[in-house]
């Protein structure tokens, strides 16, 4: 891993001093942070004012917590960075609705922004440790608002177990870290309901303590049972489920230049492959503009294989959950068991590999894909592998 993580860790306050929000504003992270000073919040819930002021209060609350300083160095740095960046998505998501300021889906938007910056500017991609630290920060940002709604949510156990399962793909992640971030977020608000919000957080996490998942994911009976539970097909997490699938379909995803074709030749030789790129080339369809016809034709090829119960590979970039969801639903509907393999490589390595291809993808297009990238989560398929190439 490059010195990218060291540069980020240097921003984190130490007991001896140094670092902090002002230092972060002068770093490459400042591009995400500075707009927050001009981003309003609803006064009923954020009497402190703009998002940057709220961020400063959240950091102060986190740094005042003894359990923050008890964390190991890497988790402490990642948690602080997640607190620093947890609301960067609000700059793009905030709007006035019915006379009140709201910021729907800002956690999801913020995670994408931060992932792209850490991937491209700090070199946290293409090797396991950098990826793990990057995704710990991004996972905390993505889900930082979820704990506030656990107590009133239907099926809170299922939501907690699904959140805890993030630790299967991001081993440094835990519900305890998410709870610490949510508590600091609540303490960083000036609002009449702050004490009540903190109480709801405590109550919302009680099932996690009972299930033993504050520090680690739940041990399901099988991957098939885990997926079925998250899909609502099993009532209790301890249940087992008979695997009635006829075989496996492999969904391969990742940015251009990550080596998907190379991985396939080495790891899945002989399997049929359905590739939107091949469909596009065969029919002379353009790589830019609407792709509905390309995806329709590729889906028809997949259906033909599914009807014959022939295992195959779906080989596409599939960079977002919404893109993958369409294919995953199709494969499951035909009774296949699905395995997702997500490949990633370093930014410069990926660009160089892409440039060496006969039909290179424009770099600007790859940058847009990176900005939309949502790596697969554990609940998307029976098996999810995340590999660096």
Say what each PLM segment does.
Residues 1-97:
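Acidic/His-rich, divalent-metal-binding segments that scaffold phosphate/diphosphate chemistry
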Residues 63-200:
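Divalent metal-dependent catalytic cores for phosphoryl transfer on phosphate-bearing substrates
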Residues 209-244:
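N-terminal pre-Walker A segment at the start of P-loop NTPase domains
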Residues 240, 244-250, 308-310:
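Pre-Walker A (Motif I) flank of P-loop NTPase domains
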Residues 248-268:
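Glycine-rich phosphate-binding P-loop
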Residues 250, 270, 348-389:
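Conserved GTP-binding G-domain of TRAFAC-class P-loop NTPases and closely related GTPase folds
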Residues 261-312, 319, 347-351:
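Conserved substrate/cofactor phosphate-moiety recognition/catalytic segment
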Residues 334-353:
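Conserved phosphate-donor/acceptor-positioning beta-strand/loop module used by diverse small-molecule
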């Amino acid at each position: 891993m490059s010195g990218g993580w060291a540069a980020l860790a240097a921003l984190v306050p130490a007991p001896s001093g140094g670092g902090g929000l002002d230092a972060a504003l002068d770093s490459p992270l400042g591009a995400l942070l500075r707009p927050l000073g001009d981003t309003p919040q609803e006064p009923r819930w954020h009497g402190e004012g703009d998002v940057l002021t709220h961020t400063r209060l959240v950091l102060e609350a986190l740094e005042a917590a003894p359990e923050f300083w008890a964390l190991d160095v890497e988790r402490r740095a990642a948690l602080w960075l997640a607190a620093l960046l947890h609301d960067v998505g609000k700059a793009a998501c905030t709007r006035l609705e019915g006379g009140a300021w709201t910021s729907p889906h800002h956690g999801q938007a913020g995670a994408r922004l931060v992932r792209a910056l850490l991937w491209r500017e700090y070199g946290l991609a293409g090797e396991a440790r950098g990826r793990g630290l990057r995704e710990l920060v991004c996972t905390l940002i993505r889900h930082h608002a979820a704990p506030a709604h656990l107590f009133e949510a239907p099926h809170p156990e299922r939501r907690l177990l699904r959140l805890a399962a993030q630790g299967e793909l991001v081993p440094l992640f835990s519900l305890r870290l998410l709870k610490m971030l949510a508590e600091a977020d609540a303490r960083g608000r000036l609002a009449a309901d702050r004490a009540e919000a903190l109480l709801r957080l405590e109550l919302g996490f009680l099932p996690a303590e009972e299930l033993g998942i504050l520090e680690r994911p739940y041990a399901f009976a099988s991957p098939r049972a885990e997926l079925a539970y998250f899909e609502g097909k099993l009532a209790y997490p301890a249940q087992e489920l008979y695997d009635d699938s006829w075989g496996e379909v492999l969904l391969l995803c990742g940015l251009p230049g990550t080596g998907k074709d190379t991985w396939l030749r080495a790891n899945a030789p002989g399997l049929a492959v359905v590739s939107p790129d091949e469909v596009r080339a065969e029919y002379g369809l353009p790589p830019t503009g609407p792709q509905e016809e390309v995806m329709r034709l590729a889906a028809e090829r997949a259906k033909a294989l599914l009807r014959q119960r022939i295992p195959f590979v779906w080989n596409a970039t599939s960079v977002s959950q919404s893109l993958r969801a369409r294919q995953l639903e199709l494969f499951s509907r035909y009774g296949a068991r699905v395995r997702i393999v997500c490949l990633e490589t370093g930014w410069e390595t990926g660009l160089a590999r892409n440039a060496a291809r006969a039909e290179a993808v424009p770099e600007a297009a790859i940058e847009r894909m990176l900005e939309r990238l949502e790596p697969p989560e554990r609940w998307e398929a029976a098996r999810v592998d995340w590999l660096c190439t």
